[in-house]
């Protein structure tokens, strides 16, 4: 099962952020209650604090039979992990065939990123190359340069660019950059402008080519996220 996308149809995703098995089981109950609103799961492994329970939790998550992105978010991109944590989490989960894709940050050293991508591709995982600017939305030229550089990475199957909107105009510029990119390239791209100014990017991003919109179960994992059921309803209305 690979992540597959249709132009103009944004899929919904939620982030699992459990620290241990009990957390995981509680979140899985919520997911089952809201499963109709969820297309994709993301497992934020940088929150995990119980190494001995990792594979047990993984089997429970995999049993949901939803496409799963494995993510280790480092402090560089607003998460809790270090670059050294990638292999610690990804290696055993890939070996156990948990999930369909791994997230690799663009800020990782190129050699490490390539080695991790190679590990994933050998087991038929997709690689989501991501970048998160937790301060601003860069100027238009920088946005385009970033997207072109990520597109040119031969290890990347999917792309994700998140910026921080300091005004509604920032969101408009990111959506325009998304549209320009997706008209030129076939590689699936997900973008979002974080903050309250960027909520529109999560609702209308699909009309500009964005592939995934992230909502939340209980607590937002990024500023400006909407509850997953509300998000699914808005997307369904807009994409009808």
UniProtKB/Swiss-Prot annotation:
UniProt key word Cytoplasm: no
GO biological process, one term: chorismate biosynthetic process
Top-level taxon of the source organism: Bacteria
Catalyzed reactions: 3-dehydroquinate = 3-dehydroshikimate + H2O
Protein EC: 4.2.1.10
Broadest EC class assigned to this enzyme: lyase
One MF term in the entry's GO annotations: 3-dehydroquinate dehydratase activity
Pathway noted in the entry: Metabolic intermediate biosynthesis; chorismate biosynthesis; chorismate from D-erythrose 4-phosphate and phosphoenolpyruvate: step 3/7
Gene3D superfamilies reported for this sequence: Aldolase class I
Active site positions, chain numbering: 132, 160
Keywords assigned by UniProt, alphabetized: Amino-acid biosynthesis, Aromatic amino acid biosynthesis, Lyase, Schiff base
Binding site for 3-dehydroquinate: 15, 42-44, 73, 202, 221, 225
Subunit: Homodimer.
Role description: Involved in the third step of the chorismate pathway, which leads to the biosynthesis of aromatic amino acids. Catalyzes the cis-dehydration of 3-dehydroquinate (DHQ) and introduces the first double bond of the aromatic ring to yield 3-dehydroshikimate.
Family: Belongs to the type-I 3-dehydroquinase family.
This protein's name: 3-dehydroquinate dehydratase
Natural source organism: Latilactobacillus sakei subsp. sakei (strain 23K)
Highest classification ranks of the organism: Bacteria, Bacillati, Bacillota, Bacilli, Lactobacillales
Gene: aroD
